[in-house]
Design a protein with these regions (language model features):
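Terminal, non-globular segments
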Residues: 1-173
């Protein structure tokens, strides 16, 4: 990733983080809502190479660690987002049916979002972080899955156009 692309991507994810903190967190959506930086990063990674996916995960994970609503240790989201975005980029990079089909991309991003939240809870428990009752965690993860399936089709065209403008013709949705 060139320095220009990395800088512009960082500014995009900073803007997404500010929108999440100032608007979406204030909405009090049922089921816990959704994380816009998580969705945008996973969608961005699905359109990218694994290297760009890992860098995307680093940028978005760093901003997610800075969030006031983050209950994990510093670096917790960063590590998980690097791994999740790399995995999504790896799955989507070599398979043109994933990159060329919006429905497959939506399913990939939605399932990766839920798996990332489950991994956050599991690694958080290993780190000694208190998340509350099992039922509340399950409601939050299921609520997030619901919102992700609703929001991902809405943001996919925007993210695809932005990714294509920044990285050229690698995104083909």
């Amino acid at each position: 990733m060139l320095a220009r692309q990395f800088s512009i991507s960082s500014l995009v994810f900073l803007l997404i983080f500010l929108i999440q903190e100032s608007v979406i967190n204030q909405l009090r959506l049922p089921g816990g809502g959704f994380s816009l930086p998580l969705l945008i990063a996973l969608t961005w990674a699905a359109l990218s190479t694994p290297t760009v996916g890992a860098l995307t995960g680093f940028i978005s994970g760093f901003f997610m660690d800075l969030s006031q609503s983050s209950s994990g240790a510093m670096g917790h989201w960063t590590l998980l987002m690097i791994l999740a975005c790399y995995a999504v980029a790896f799955l989507g990079f070599g398979n043109d049916s994933v990159r060329g089909n919006p429905i497959t991309n939506i399913l990939l991003v939605s399932s990766a979002s839920v798996l990332t939240l489950v991994a956050f809870v599991i690694t958080g428990v290993l780190l000694g972080i208190s998340f509350g009752s099992f039922g509340r965690v399950l409601i939050t993860i299921m609520g997030n899955a619901f919102w992700v399936v609703l929001v991902t089709p809405l943001i996919l065209p925007f993210v695809t156009r932005l990714h294509r403008a920044l990285f050229g013709n690698q995104a083909r949705i």
